[in-house]
């Protein structure tokens, strides 16, 4: 009985192993028919979407040291140093810094800034060997990043989730095609069209009821 029991367990385990191997191979074969999801970085780089929140850009001359960015930041991240000018009777900005090693890129500071001195960029290449180098002061924050599409040594690729319908390879992107997602004016046009269609249906229903 012990021998037969062991044989039965062995056969059961063999069937389970074959089942799991079959499931794994099914996933492999399924991905063989899909488009590639890898990017040959740094020779290829993704073009960020329209609403991508990358490194913060700061304009020193526009800042009024109101510290609203500090108050709306979930982690109180921006460091704003200012001095009070007794002659002008107002604050004068001395220094401004953001530590991108801690920043969660929520862009609350950009949204609530009253003078628009803060803006988000497409820059996502912030890797460094020393985390202290991620603490950007006003000079570093004032530098504008270079665009992926302007680098002759890089092949720009659109984000795979935003490829146009019918396009499965980001290398074969049609010229002049939209970058990623829908632009605000397109969303607004769709909303207006939907609202007009709804108003037309209501008018038709009212005429039929009368």
Swiss-Prot record:
SUPFAM superfamilies: 4Fe-4S ferredoxins (SSF54862). It is found in: Cellular thylakoid membrane. GO terms for molecular function: 4 iron, 4 sulfur cluster binding; iron ion binding; NADH dehydrogenase (ubiquinone) activity; quinone binding. It catalyses: a plastoquinone + NADH + (n+1) H(+)(in) = a plastoquinol + NAD(+) + n H(+)(out); a plastoquinone + NADPH + (n+1) H(+)(in) = a plastoquinol + NADP(+) + n H(+)(out). It is a peripheral membrane protein. NDH-1 shuttles electrons from an unknown electron donor, via FMN and iron-sulfur (Fe-S) centers, to quinones in the respiratory and/or the photosynthetic chain. The immediate electron acceptor for the enzyme in this species is believed to be plastoquinone. Couples the redox reaction to proton translocation, and thus conserves the redox energy in a proton gradient. This is NAD(P)H-quinone oxidoreductase subunit I. It comes from Synechococcus sp. (strain JA-3-3Ab).
């Amino acid at each position: 009985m012990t021998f037969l029991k062991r044989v039965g367990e062995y056969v059961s385990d063999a069937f389970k192993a074959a089942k799991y191997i079959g499931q794994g191979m099914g996933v492999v074969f399924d991905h063989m028919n899909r488009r590639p999801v890898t990017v040959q970085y740094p020779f290829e780089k993704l073009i960020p979407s329209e609403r991508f929140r990358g490194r913060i850009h700061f304009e020193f001359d526009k800042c009024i040291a109101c510290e609203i960015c500090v108050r709306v930041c979930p982690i109180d991240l921006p460091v704003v140093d200012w001095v009070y000018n007794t002659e002008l009777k107002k604050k004068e900005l001395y220094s401004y810094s953001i530590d991108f090693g801690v920043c969660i890129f929520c862009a609350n500071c950009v949204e609530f800034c009253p003078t628009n001195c803060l803006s988000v960029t497409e820059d996502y290449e912030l890797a460094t060997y020393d985390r202290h180098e991620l603490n950007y002061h006003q000079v570093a924050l004032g530098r504008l990043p270079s665009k992926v599409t302007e680098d002759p040594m890089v092949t720009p690729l659109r984000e795979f989730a935003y490829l146009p319908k019918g396009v499965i390879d980001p290398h074969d992107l049609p010229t002049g095609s939209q970058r990623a997602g829908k632009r605000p004016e397109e969303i607004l046009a769709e909303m207006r069209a939907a609202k007009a269609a709804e108003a037309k249906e209501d008018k038709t229903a009212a005429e039929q009821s009368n």
